[in-house]
Amino acid sequence: MGRVTAPEPLSAFHQVAEFVSGEAVLDDWLKQKGLKNQALGAARTFVVCKKDTKQVAGFYSLATGSVNHTEATGNLRRNMPDPIPVIILARLAVDLSFHGKGLGADLLHDAVLRCYRVAENIGVRAIMVHALTEEAKNFYIHHGFKSSQTQQRTLFLRLPQ
């Protein structure tokens, strides 16, 4: 990741006030709810910071969830209960100053590896994401996610069994 720190759990020491990704809903969530959700255990948020600072350059957030068979792709439904257990990639955003530099892909890669490690210890079938925009949807498709049967911007990446 070079110009940023390794991913680490969000804490009160991280500076989020100046984070601007271009998606206000993601920026506001990080600034207003990120730490609260972390403390409550509702989601786990991981951040990367600009090198030698605590200023957040990007983040992603993971939570547990489930998806009904009707929304899942065919290969996820096979031999699975209804609903199917998943890990939700609830948010992923990169500060505008790092757009176009591969940081989003690096964060996604870290999130997927983290989810793989979780799947070795608990029963989850896939990573699920709700893309905010068509651009975000195309980003996830480019990285191997498959679209839902029924929800246009819901995508899945199957985890190994």
From Swiss-Prot:
Q: What is the effect of changing residue 140 to F?
A: Protein is not toxic in E.coli, probably catalytically inactive
Which residues of this protein are catalytic? 140
Among the GO molecular function terms of this UniProt record, one is: tRNA binding
Deletion phenotype, per the entry, is: Both tacT1 and tacA1-tacT1 can be deleted without an effect on growth in cell culture; in a tacT1 deletion, transcription of tacA1 is increased 28.6-fold.
Q: What is its EC number?
A: 2.3.1.-
The entry marks the following residues as binding acetyl-CoA, namely 92, 94, 99-100, 102, 104-105, 132, 135, 142
Record keywords, A-Z: Acyltransferase, Repressor, RNA-binding, Toxin-antitoxin system, Transcription, Transcription regulation, Transferase, tRNA-binding
Q: What is the effect of changing residue 37 to A?
A: Mild attenuation of toxicity in E.coli
Q: What is the effect of changing residue 78 to A?
A: Significant attenuation of toxicity in E.coli
Query: What triggers production of this protein?
Result: Not highly transcribed in minimal medium, probably autorepressed by the TacA1-TacT1 complex. Part of the probable tacA1-tacT1 operon.
The record's catalysed reaction(s) read: glycyl-tRNA(Gly) + acetyl-CoA = N-acetylglycyl-tRNA(Gly) + CoA + H(+); L-lysyl-[protein] + acetyl-CoA = N(6)-acetyl-L-lysyl-[protein] + CoA + H(+)
Q: What is the effect of changing residue 132 to E?
A: Attenuated toxicity in E.coli
> What residues does tRNA bind to?
29, 33, 36-37, 75, 77-81, 91
* Job of this protein: Toxic component of a type II toxin-antitoxin (TA) system. Acetylates all 3 Gly-tRNA(Gly) isoacceptors, no other tRNAs are acetylated, tRNA acetylation inhibits translation. Specifically recognizes the discriminator bases U73 and the C2-G71 pair of the tRNA acceptor stem, as well as the charged aminoacyl moiety. Expression in the absence of antitoxin is toxic in E.coli. Upon induction of the toxin gene during lag phase, the lag phase is extended by several hours. Neutralized by cognate antitoxin TacA1. Also acetylates cognate antitoxin TacA1. The TacA1-TacT1 complex represses and probably derepresses expression of its own operon. TacA1-TacT1 complex binds 2 sites in its promoter DNA; neither protein binds DNA alone, it is presumed TacA1 actually binds DNA.
- Kindly give the PANTHER family that the UniProt entry links to this protein: ACETYLTRANSFERASE, ACETYLTRANSFERASE-RELATED
Q: Which additional comment does the entry carry? A: There are 3 TacA-TacT systems in this strain.
Query: Which family would the database say this protein is a member of?
Result: Belongs to the acetyltransferase family. GNAT subfamily.
Q: How does it assemble?
A: Homodimer; each subunit binds 1 Gly-tRNA(Gly) with the help of the other subunit. Binds to cognate antitoxin TacA1 as a dimer of dimers.
Record-given protein name: tRNA-acetylating toxin 1
**Which organism is this entry from?**
Salmonella typhimurium (strain LT2 / SGSC1412 / ATCC 700720)
Q: What is the lineage of its organism?
A: Bacteria, Pseudomonadati, Pseudomonadota, Gammaproteobacteria, Enterobacterales
